[in-house]
Regions:
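A conserved beta-strand-loop-helix scaffold within acyl/acetyltransferase catalytic domains
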Residues: 12-19, 24-42
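A short, internal acetyl-CoA/4′-phosphopantetheine-binding micro-motif in the GNAT/acyltransferase core
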Residues: 48-55
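Conserved GNAT acetyl-CoA-binding A-motif
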Residues: 69-83
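Short, compact, well-ordered microdomains
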Residues: 79, 84-91, 95
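Conserved catalytic-core motifs of GNAT/GCN5-like acyltransferases
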Residues: 96-108
Length: 108
């Protein structure tokens, strides 16, 4: 498979703690999950999942971009616990301004 987004009509289903990516048949092919902290001002991004048959198609990157766009539009912050999200930030550093790293505030 290529690293381009598949030529399907992707739909996104937003819930309070996750966003699902659905194919044109309504089947779940990807999901990002999170929980909220700081009086719902900070998303803690925990996981990114893509169906094995759809990996390598940029679906994870598209979902991550949509979620981070939502977070920045809401003027909220996020903690990237998910390794995919952290890797995504290396390629799309403009989203780092909304990233929050609690350990940066601790004194050692």
């Amino acid at each position: 498979m290529t690293h381009e987004t598949e030529a399907v009509n992707l739909k996104y289903e937003w819930r309070s703690t996750r966003v699902r990516c659905l194919d044109d048949q309504g089947q779940r092919i990807g999901e990002i999950g999170w929980h909220m902290i700081d009086d719902d001002q900070t998303y803690v991004i925990e996981r990114t999942w893509v169906d094995p048959n759809h990996r390598g198609t940029a679906i994870a990157a598209e979902m991550t971009k949509k979620l981070l766009d939502k977070i920045t539009t809401e003027n909220k912050k996020f903690i990237p616990l998910c390794s995919f999200t952290e890797h995504f930030l290396d390629k799309e550093p403009q989203y780092r301004k909304a990233a929050y790293y609690p350990h940066d505030e601790e004194e050692f």
